[in-house]
Amino acid sequence: MIQTKDIIELTDTYGANNYHPLPIVISKAEGVWVEDPEGNRYMDLLSAYSAVNQGHRHPKIINALIDQANRVTLTSRAFHSDQLGPWYEKVAKLTNKEMVLPMNTGAEAVETAIKTVRRWAYDVKKVEANRAEIIVCEDNFHGRTMGSVSMSSNEEYKRGFGPMLPGIVVIPYGDLEALKAAITPNTAAFILEPIQGEAGINIPPAGYLKEAFEVCKKENVLFVADEIQTGLSRTGKVFACDWDNVTPDMYILGKALGGGVFPISCVAANRDILGVFEPGSHGSTFGGNPLACAVSIAALEVLEEEKLTERSLQLGEKLVGQLKEIDNPMITEVRGKGLFIGIELNEPARPYCEQLKAAGLLCKETHENVIRIAPPLVISEEDLEWAFQKIKAVLS
C-alpha cells in the first residue's frame, strides 16, 4: 500500500507550490476522525475550513449522493433537472430570500455577488456607467479569483497578478465611522464577513453588523454578507449575521452547503436585486447540477434534524470557557462564536499546530499567530473534552 511519504513526494513533484499543508495524508475519514495510510487516527479540528460541518461522510449525505449518481449527475442549465427547483425552494426559505443563483465554489459565488451588485448599481440605483464602487474590509478573505483578490488588503495575495479590479474601497473592519465616510453616490455594496475567518476569527464589536446594515439601508447601499465559512450553523446560529439580528440584502454561501461531499455555492437575495439578470448574462455549466443539489438538500436537512446549530452554540461556549482558563502568557486571547474559535498567541502558531498533530489533533494556523479550532459540529462532548485536554497539554 502506498505510504504517506510517497504521496507527499508525488505531490511535491507534480503539484504547483501554492499550498503549505501539514505533512499528513488523509486516506479515510468518518465523523470527526481521519486516518492516514499507516492507520494513524487524528481528530479533525479544521473541518476543511468549515466545509465539513456535518462531519466526514455523513450517511444521509452519502446516500443522497449515491442515489442521485445512479439516476443523473449533470444536465447543464440548458435543461431543467428534478433537483434544482426543490433545492432553490429550500435555500430560499432558509435565507428568507426570493431568489437564489447557484454556482460551485465559494469564490465563484463571490464573483457572482460582485457582478450582481454592480449591475444593480447601474440598472436600479442609476450609478453612472463604469463608476460603481464596492466597500470591503481590511484583512478580509473572499477567495482567490481576480475579483476576490482585488478586494483583499493583503498585498502578497495580489503580487504579480495586476492590474486589479477598479472601484474597490477598503476600510477597517468593525469601524462604523469609516463605513459612513467611505460611502459615495457611486457605492453599490458593502461586502463583509460577519466574522473574519482567515484574519484569525476576528469578531466585530457587538451591534456593529446591525448598525452597518442600517447605515447601508439609509444610503441605498446593498449589505452583502459572505457567510461561506460562518454560515450554516458554524457560529452557533444558522448565519453569523443572526447574532445581530440582521438579514442582509444578499447572502453568499458555500462550503458546508455541500456537506463536505460535493461543491456547491450560491448567492441569495430578493427579486429586486437578483432580478437584474436575464438569460445569458451569467451562468455555470455545473452550477446547480442535480448531483450537487441532491447532496445539498441532504446536507441542509442534517443541520436541522440533528440540531447542529444548537450543538455548536452549546459546545462552543463550553470550549471557549475552558480554553480561557489555560494559564500561559503566550496566549493573548481566546475568542469565538459557537465552534468557530481562535487561540491567538504572541508567537507563530505553526509549531504548535505541528505539536497538536503529533498529539492526534489536526489544526491549522491562520493569520500567522492564531490557532483555528473548528471541528465538525457532530463532535461528541467526550471527543471535544479529549481534544481540549490535548490542546491544554500542548499550550501549557
UniProtKB/Swiss-Prot annotation:
Entry keyword annotation includes Transferase: yes
Cellular localization per UniProt: Cytoplasm
Uppermost EC category: transferase
Residues modified to N6-(pyridoxal phosphate)lysine: K255
Any GO BP annotation: L-proline biosynthetic process
Catalytic activity: a 2-oxocarboxylate + L-ornithine = L-glutamate 5-semialdehyde + an L-alpha-amino acid
EC number(s) recorded for this UniProt protein: 2.6.1.13
Pathway linked to the protein: Amino-acid biosynthesis; L-proline biosynthesis; L-glutamate 5-semialdehyde from L-ornithine: step 1/1
GO terms for MF: identical protein binding; ornithine aminotransferase activity; pyridoxal phosphate binding
UniProtKB keywords: Amino-acid biosynthesis, Aminotransferase, Cytoplasm, Proline biosynthesis, Pyridoxal phosphate, Transferase
Cofactor: pyridoxal 5'-phosphate
Domain of life: Bacteria
Main location as per UniProt: cytoplasm
Cellular component terms per the entry's GO annotation: cytoplasm
Family: Belongs to the class-III pyridoxal-phosphate-dependent aminotransferase family. OAT subfamily.
HAMAP family: Ornith_aminotrans_3
Task of the protein: Catalyzes the interconversion of ornithine to glutamate semialdehyde.
Official protein name in the record: Ornithine aminotransferase
